[in-house]
Each structure stands twice: as C-alpha cells, then as structure tokens.
Amino acid sequence: MSETVGNGENFPAVAARDDRLVWVDLEMTGLDLERHVIVEVAALVTDANLNILGEGVDLVVHATDEELARMDDFVTRMHDSSGLTPLIRASTVSLKDAEDAVLALIEEHCDPAHPAPLAGNSIATDRAFIREQMPRLDAALHYRMVDVSSVKELARRWCPRVYYKQPTKGLAHRALADIVESIRELDYYRRSFFVADPGPTSAQCEADAETSVARFAHYLE
C-alpha cells in the first residue's frame, strides 16, 4: 500500500510522493540574465510537513574570470565576505553537473507524474535563472511556487507580532544555509500564523520561533 497524507476529512488522500516541495536557492554573479551566471546551487526536498528528506545538493559551480569580472561591487563584496569567490575559481563542477544532481534528488524523492512546486524565499529571480540556464530542471518543477516571502508580507500586515518574532536569519549568503532558514521560517509561520483568530500571543510566537530554530539547528551547524 502506498504512503498517503491523511487529512481527517472525507477528502481524497494524497500520496506522500505527490506532496513534496523542492527547495532551491542559487547564488549568482548578479541579477541580469544576459550577463550573469549561476555560481552556487543548493536543493533540498521536504515532505508536506516540512521534514527534510535525504542529504540534498550543495554545489559550487565554476565560473571564468571573465564571468566573475561582471559582478558589481556589492556582489563582489558579498561573495568575498562569504568565502564563495575562491571556491568558485577552484570548482570543477559545471552547471550541467549541478542541474543533474538536483534532477537526481527530485527523481529520488518525488513522483515525476506529479511535479513538485519550487519553494524558497523571494524565488522569482531564482526561477528566472533556472528557466534560462537550467531548462531541464525548470521542466521538472510544477509551474506553481511556494514563496515564503509572500507569507512574511501577509504576516507583517495581518499579524505583526508573528512577523516581529520570526526566527533571526544568519544572512550567510550561502545557498544551503539560505534554504534551511527558509524552511525553518515557513515551519514557524505554520505554527504561529496559520491558526484561528485572534492568533497567538507574543509569548507563543517566541516559543514557536524557539521550536523552529531547535528543529533545524543541526542543519545550520
């Protein structure tokens, strides 16, 4: 019997492999699709309850000196500060290698007959680069996306205490850490925001933030 996700109501059960989320975060040399390239790819798959499945993908992609020279001052400082730039120069991983690795992760955990949505924080730019530079990956993902930043903006307007008590981000500007922090943030919103009116107290928000931080702490060590 196939694994299913129960709902406690008289609705059709959903097979677990049909209910995955594919979390992808990219680091690029900039935001211009015509001039800039992907230099780091990280991916994780979660089930419907945000449990991380498997080891995921965390790869630095090689870029030429010419491609790196197209970075503006802000991106140059960011990648230098995070330690990414020397890793890019030393990497022997191609963008195709990284795309293949993410596709293998999806094949392992997801049902290809039911493409999973792309998930992340402010993922429109990531999706644009995926569409342009990793078209096979784009084709393997559902057209729908789960953008945690949309939930953040709603929380800021509808329940400010939830917004202001969210777990603090490390701002490492490295792809895998960014993904785990996005999953953690959505886990927090699930606990504190998607509840009946009048919503949680500030103390409950703080407790929910601590629970979400503890749940994902070992991924960020």
From Swiss-Prot:
CDD domains: Orn (cd06135). Its main location: cytoplasm. It is found in: Cytoplasm. GO terms for molecular function: 3'-5'-RNA exonuclease activity; nucleic acid binding. It is an enzyme of class 3 (hydrolase). Keywords: Cytoplasm, Exonuclease, Hydrolase, Nuclease. This is Oligoribonuclease. It comes from Corynebacterium efficiens (strain DSM 44549 / YS-314 / AJ 12310 / JCM 11189 / NBRC 100395). The gene is orn.
